[in-house]
Amino acid sequence: MLPASGLAVLLVTALKFSTAAPSLPAASPRTSRNNYRLAQAYLDKYYTKKGGPQIGEMVARGGNSTVKKIKELQEFFGLRVTGKLDRATMDVIKRPRCGVPDVANYRLFPGEPKWKKNTLTYRISKYTPSMTPAEVDRAMEMALRAWSSAVPLNFVRINAGEADIMISFETGDHGDSYPFDGPRGTLAHAFAPGEGLGGDTHFDNAEKWTMGTNGFNLFTVAAHEFGHALGLAHSTDPSALMFPTYKYQNPYGFRLPKDDVKGIQALYGPRRAFSGKPTAPHGPPHNPSIPDLCDSNLSFDAVTMLGKELLLFRDRIFWRRQVHLMSGIRPSTITSSFPQLMSNVDAAYEVAERGTAYFFKGPHYWITRGFQMQGPPRTIYDFGFPRYVQRIDAAVYLKDAQKTLFFVGDEYYSYDERKRKMEKDYPKSTEEEFSGVNGQIDAAVELNGYIYFFSGPKAYKSDTEKEDVVSELKSSSWIGC
């Protein structure tokens, strides 16, 4: 993995090429004229010295010999180096890929570009019609979290003003000298760390974006591009997220490959765990591993009761507090109490009558009695979820009804804890049933007959009998802010 500067572009090899006679070496009779044109366009784009009006000069390592370009391509992708357009080489050329040239070094920024601070802001200024805003928000958050899990960087979303990383979906010429070209051409591009356009990430609004596989997976593209926005170039490791060619990555349960971890930590160093010691009255000293206690944008991944304590999870840490007391609130690393979970708990709930709690992460869940894990992880499909559900956003146990509500995207399921069976006629619309909650539900917990829903930096108190929100607080107030 190499640091990068300048612009990075993720694209699918275009279908329109120059009709000029290609200057390629002789090939077998099976090699079609379309393959010649495709290869020439590919080599011109990724293995030839080019310039960019706002990006800076890109200097190729080698000469312009076509045979030499082919050999460079073959060497980069680990193919047999022949200088000929054999089948394996053409297979590589036809793959969707990122548009950063494999033989160039950008010169826009001196040295190895990286951010000089640990907390970066991001803002999504324009959305795509392919997905709901909540889905786009979630994809971006997950893509950034993939990187912050490995290095001491924190990402804070803002809704107005200029952010370090400005994210938008654009069409055609959008003012940065790198116009988009419509469906199945360039997918996205990102600028390396720096002032002005530095860090900005643009997605082609002409593409069909999705969180699944029926289109271009937004998480996959965003995670790759954010790697460039943080300062990484391409990797020659085919298993790496930063490998040049597009490869679908499942957003749920994704873990940054080792090569990417090595590269990003070379720039920013490893993320260090918090010591878990009690905090002073005004909060802990600054530590990049812990979200600022009184950050107005603080949100939680999961919230649950466990015995007489309330647990609130965020990234690699969780807070423990008494329900009716604000004193003694203390953060700890998740691994210190739940080593099997590591980090990033998706959802959690407790059935107090049984003395058991359930923790969800990706397509798996764990059962605990107190802080003691009860065996290995199990599959969430034990609950009766359809196979397309691959993670749970939030869960809350309703004591009187003896039912658990599971929130997945903009829908929710109802699970009968007595019958150990998912109820019929679900999922249902979360917005229709809980209309007072704005945004996707990240976490939920029932206390004293009320359901508290956490959505981003806000917590909503919902009266289950009136089916209405009765008050709204900042999520950070739950840890004493």
From Swiss-Prot:
Residue stretches spanning the membrane: none
Gene that encodes the chain: MMP20
Keyword tags: Autocatalytic cleavage, Calcium, Disulfide bond, Extracellular matrix, Glycoprotein, Hydrolase, Metal-binding, Metalloprotease, Protease, Repeat, Secreted, Signal, Zinc, Zymogen
Annotated Pfam families: Hemopexin, Peptidase_M10, PG_binding_1
Annotated protein name in UniProt: Matrix metalloproteinase-20
SUPFAM superfamilies assigned to the protein according to its UniProt record, in alphabetical order: Hemopexin-like domain (SSF50923), Metalloproteases ('zincins'), catalytic domain (SSF55486), PGBD-like (SSF47090)
Domain of life: Eukaryota
Signal peptide: 1-20
Group of enzyme by EC: hydrolase
Binding site for Ca(2+) 2: 181-182, 184, 186, 204, 207
Description of its domains: The conserved cysteine present in the cysteine-switch motif binds the catalytic zinc ion, thus inhibiting the enzyme. The dissociation of the cysteine from the zinc ion upon the activation-peptide release activates the enzyme.
Keyword Metal-binding: yes
Post-translational modification: Autoactivates at least at the 105-Asn-|-Tyr-106 site.
Binding site for Zn(2+) 2: 174, 176, 189, 202
